[in-house]
């Protein structure tokens, strides 16, 4: 019968233990070297900002292909400038400020990062009391402010056929409310396009695809400022 030598067994255990420790050390060193030499991974792409274009047929793209609408052309213009954005088309043809107020709450689900508010053209065309349009827009801006959503308010101008008093009262709505709520104002959404037969449809009211392109070109700096504000607001909310 073979007897085990305790001293030999102890030596073997020590050798095995030291060997295991040495292998672990080598693996740790090798891993550290690999980490040092490994290329740095780029940060994941930021989630695109969601901007809702909330308006009437001027926003929706009346008689245009979806790709020719204001939201679609605006998104392409912003992406060309390097902005990661998703512009949601929340335009409703025929909408007045009353219609916009009625659907604002569900349009804000989920809450967007910013909104372009373009309403009032149909109020002016129908001769709706400017006080009503003012009240509706005021309520919408109050809701957006309470939700901490950055806003670009796109102004409208009343047609002259309603008389000078109506025009003055209506046109004052947008700068007044922009100042009251501390939001950015683009004075006239149809700037450079209204009354231009080359940039409007035969109805003389709605922009063609080329008309939309002109609107986008003119409003783009203001929307870029809105994007920056939305980014800052989003970053502050995370802290």
Where are these regions (language model features)?
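Short histidine/acidic/glycine/proline-rich micro-motifs that form metal-
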Residues: 58-61, 65, 91-95, 122-124, ...
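Alpha-helical cap/lid subdomain in secreted, periplasmic
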Residues: 8, 73-84, 99-239
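N-terminal secretory signal peptides that target proteins for export/translocation
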Residues: 1-20
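Bacterial N-terminal signal peptides
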Residues: 24-36
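Serine-esterase "nucleophile elbow" of acetyl-processing enzymes
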Residues: 41-93, 103-111
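Structured catalytic cores of enzymes that bind and process phosphorylated ligands/cofactors
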Residues: 2, 40-43, 47, 151, ...
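Compositionally biased, disordered extreme N-termini, encompassing classical targeting presequences
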Residues: 18-21, 36-48, 233-239
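Compositionally biased regions
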Residues: 12-14, 18, 26, 38, ...
């Amino acid at each position: 019968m073979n007897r085990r030598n305790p001293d030999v067994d102890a030596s073997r255990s020590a050798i095995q233990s030291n060997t295991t420790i040495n292998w672990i050390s080598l693996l740790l060193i090798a891993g550290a070297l690999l980490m040092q030499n490994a290329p740095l991974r780029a940060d994941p792409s930021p989630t695109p900002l969601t901007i809702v274009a909330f308006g009437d047929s001027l926003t929706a793209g009346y008689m245009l292909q979806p790709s020719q609408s204001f939201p679609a052309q605006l998104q392409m213009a912003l992406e060309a400038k390097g902005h990661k954005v998703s512009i949601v088309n929340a335009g409703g043809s025929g909408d007045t400020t009353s219609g916009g107020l009625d659907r604002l709450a569900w349009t804000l689900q989920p809450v967007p990062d910013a909104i372009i508010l373009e309403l009032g053209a149909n109020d002016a065309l129908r001769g709706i009391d400017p006080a009503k349009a003012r009240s509706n827009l005021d309520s919408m801006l109050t809701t957006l402010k309470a939700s901490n959503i950055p806003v670009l308010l796109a102004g409208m101008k009343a047609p002259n056929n309603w008389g000078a008093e109506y025009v003055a009262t209506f046109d004052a709505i947008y700068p007044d409310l922009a100042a009251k709520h501390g939001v950015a104002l683009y004075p006239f959404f149809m700037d450079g396009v209204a009354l231009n037969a080359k940039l409007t449809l035969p109805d003389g009211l709605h922009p063609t695809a080329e008309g939309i392109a002109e609107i986008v070109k003119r409003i783009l700096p203001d929307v870029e400022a809105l994007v920056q504000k939305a980014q800052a607001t989003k970053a502050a909310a995370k802290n």
